[in-house]
């Protein structure tokens, strides 16, 4: 179920490379990667999961509200991270020239399906 949802998000996002459903502990629940890509999507997301914990803690300390989404741009990629629950998030990597807006939309649209599947 998770793989189908992740594949749909990546396939429908122009320039989508891969997506990972992951816990804040850095353990992937499921993932989908486009073939022949030169980036280790899971490794990128594992490393950013530590940063997410710090951002979440800072937002709580400053009473900024619940974190919903983080976007990171590099000269090659865009990483979009959507928070699902207090334990899980979904992350997608898009080529720099990909359709960032559609990727965000699809991740938001499919969030409830992922949350429901997590039980």
How should these model regions be labeled?
Residues 1-18, 22-119:
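Non-catalytic interaction/Regulatory regions outside core domains
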